[in-house]
């Protein structure tokens, strides 16, 4: 097998590495740099990539930056002249450039690659990344998470067993914290958390805003609308940020930045590290949320962490390093170049695929929960977030109406308990279900997530063996903002969600109780005196009235009354018939109290009401 290169396709910068012997090595670009700006420009019919494109990013309107933030975003396109490009196509230009100079370095054709993505990338974004690789002529052998890749680079030659490692990854446009366990060649991700709209660009912007404000106060000129000035300010802000990682103060000089009534105007400013820390303190503190959540999701405290790894160029900022040290209670490991660790780790994974690296197993996780919509609009999870991948999970569901000929499977991703608040990944239909009473058909829904975090869903009628499958397409994925909003909303609306979930559960229980009680009364008709069933019938009528009036308090009260009446009837039937008929009668009215709950035995049915979930699948008219 030919060499498998490892690519860190970053928001701001990208890097590439390859395994030489047993060691990963960064491949420099034609300019001799170890990282390449993730910038694409169109000028005079020529496509420019990297440093040359970055230098004229603001002055040339046909320059695309940070395209990674739009990967997997449905309908998003960049218009250049009379042509439109998808994020996959723009990313492919970057990958093609990387592929070309990698081939020049290796002296052979490159066809295979491992590409990294932020840990919080969803299915759609991962699919889009694979598509970009295909467009660039690369066979993407594996998609792995950036923090996981950096841990691979750190742990390749480590012999310690059962190390728990926290990876703090602050890049140019994204931020992640991951907790991994390393031991005996196994790299297992325990949890991941992050903010996909936070990175070094935000720190640069704070310096730019400060310079613009000061210049406006001193000269009465607003530079924020001057494209030429903004390009120079952006470059100066990035340089000042980097300088302040090594010195306590830096001088910013931008002569002839603008012009006033008296002639040319020059920008001169001194920025101290203390002032920079003040301007960006809230950004640093914002990362603490993901830091704490990652530990909590892994069921750990900082005392359980053996090593802390800093990843991403923005972790060179002294205030960031100090904050992580204070939070973790230990000095971060500085043995890996934070700009290069991800690409190095990807190259190691490439070595695993090609067979050059032995005895390493990578176990990653899925960042968001996956499931389907069930009765009452509830989001029923089949795979929880932070589940190790690859994985597969099956669960039995049933129909919501008698003689229902088809089910519509609504696939969702998110953390909210109600389907309407989560993100639709796809829908598909399972048809030709034989006529049967509600709750009788057994529909097995299976979720499969492969090693790249890409989702496949199937639904199978266990009675007929008929099956329908779907692979979630990238056009239906989530944006970075939607992922962040999902978890934020889940925290802010926890109480509201709980109340809505309880209401839906009550309605489901009432509906099921009415259904089975009516069935029981019909089965006992003519077999027992009406005086024996009058209390049940009266309680049933009262519950149906409360349901019609949509009175939740009344529904709860009348449901309990009907359950008690049904229980009393079951006892009488048991006494009259020696137990056999009574047992059946008891199972009928009581079963609904447990109905509509997920079955956790992956399809085993013990005949009780709690063995399947009412799917509330949409009824399909076979004549349409």
From Swiss-Prot:
GO terms for molecular function: ATP binding; ATP-dependent protein folding chaperone; unfolded protein binding. PROSITE patterns: HSP70_1, HSP70_2, HSP70_3. Residues 577-605 have a biased composition (Low complexity). It holds the Pfam family HSP70. It comes from the Bacteria. Keywords: ATP-binding, Chaperone, Nucleotide-binding, Phosphoprotein, Stress response. This is Chaperone protein DnaK. Acts as a chaperone. It comes from Lactobacillus johnsonii (strain CNCM I-12250 / La1 / NCC 533).
């Amino acid at each position: 097998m030919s060499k498998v290169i490892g690519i860190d396709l970053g928001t701001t910068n990208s890097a590439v590495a390859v395994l030489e012997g047993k060691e990963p090595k960064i491949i420099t670009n034609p300019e001799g740099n170890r990282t390449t700006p993730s910038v694409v420009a169109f000028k005079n019919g020529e496509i420019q990539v990297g440093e040359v494109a970055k230098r004229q990013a603001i002055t040339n309107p046909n320059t695309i930056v940070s395209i990674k933030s739009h990967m997997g975003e449905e309908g998003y396109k960049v218009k250049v002249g009379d042509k439109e490009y998808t994020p996959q196509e723009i990313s492919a230009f970057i990958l093609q450039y990387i592929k070309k100079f990698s081939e020049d370095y290796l002296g052979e054709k490159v066809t295979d690659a491992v590409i990294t993505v932020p840990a919080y990338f969803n299915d759609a974004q991962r699919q889009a990344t694979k598509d970009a690789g295909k467009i660039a002529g690369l066979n993407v052998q594996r998609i792995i998470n950036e923090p996981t890749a950096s841990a691979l680079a750190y742990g390749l030659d480590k012999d310690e067993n059962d190390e728990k490692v926290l990876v703090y990854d602050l890049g140019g446009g994204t931020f992640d914290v991951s907790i991994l366990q390393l031991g005996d060649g196994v790299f297992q991700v325990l949890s991941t958390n992050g903010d996909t709209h936070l990175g070094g660009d935000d720190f640069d912007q704070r310096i730019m805003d400060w310079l613009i404000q000061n210049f406006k106060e001193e000269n009465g000129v607003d530079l924020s609308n001057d494209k030429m000035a903004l390009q120079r300010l952006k470059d100066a802000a990035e340089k000042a940020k980097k300088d302040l990682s090594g010195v306590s103060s830096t001088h910013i000089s931008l002569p002839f930045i603008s012009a006033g009534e008296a002639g040319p105007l020059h920008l001169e400013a001194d920025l101290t590290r203390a002032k920079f820390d003040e301007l960006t303190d809230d950004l640093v503190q914002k990362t603490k949320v993901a830091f704490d959540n990652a530990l909590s999701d892994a069921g750990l405290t900082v005392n359980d962490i053996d090593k802390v790894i800093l990843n991403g160029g923005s972790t060179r900022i002294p205030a960031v390093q100090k904050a992580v040290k204070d939070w973790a209670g230990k000095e971060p490991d500085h043995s890996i170049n934070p700009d290069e660790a991800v690409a190095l780790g990807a190259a190691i994974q490439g070595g695993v695929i090609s067979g050059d690296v032995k005895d390493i197993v990578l176990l990653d996780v899925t960042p968001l929960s996956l499931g389907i919509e069930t009765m009452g609009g509830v989001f029923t999870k089949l795979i929880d977030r932070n589940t190790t991948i690859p994985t597969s999970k099956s669960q039995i569901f049933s129909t919501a109406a008698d003689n229902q000929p088809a089910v519509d499977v609504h696939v969702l991703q998110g953390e909210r308990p109600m389907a309407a608040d989560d993100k639709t990944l796809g829908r598909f239909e399972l048809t030709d279900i034989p006529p049967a009473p509600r709750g009788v058909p057994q529909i097995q829904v299976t979720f499969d997530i492969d090693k790249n975090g890409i989702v496949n869903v199937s639904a199978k009628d266990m009675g007929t063996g008929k099956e329908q499958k779907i692979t979630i397409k990238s056009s239906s994925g989530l944006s970075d903002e939607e992922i962040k909003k999902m978890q934020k909303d889940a925290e802010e609306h926890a109480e509201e969600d709980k109340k809505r979930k309880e209401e839906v559960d009550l309605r489901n229980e009432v509906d099921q109780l009415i259904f089975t009680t009516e069935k029981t009364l019909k089965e006992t008709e003519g077999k027992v005196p009406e005086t024996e069933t009058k209390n049940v019938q009266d309680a049933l009528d009262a519950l149906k009235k409360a349901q019609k009036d949509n009175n939740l308090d009344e529904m709860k009260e009348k449901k309990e009354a009907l359950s008690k009446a049904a229980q009393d009837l079951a006892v009488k039937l048991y006494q009259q018939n020696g137990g056999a008929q009574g047992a059946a009668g008891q199972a009928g009215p009581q079963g609904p109290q447990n109905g509509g709950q997920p079955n956790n035995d992956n399809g085993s049915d013990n005949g009780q009401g709690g063995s399947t979930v009412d799917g509330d699948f949409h009824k399909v008219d076979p004549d349409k």
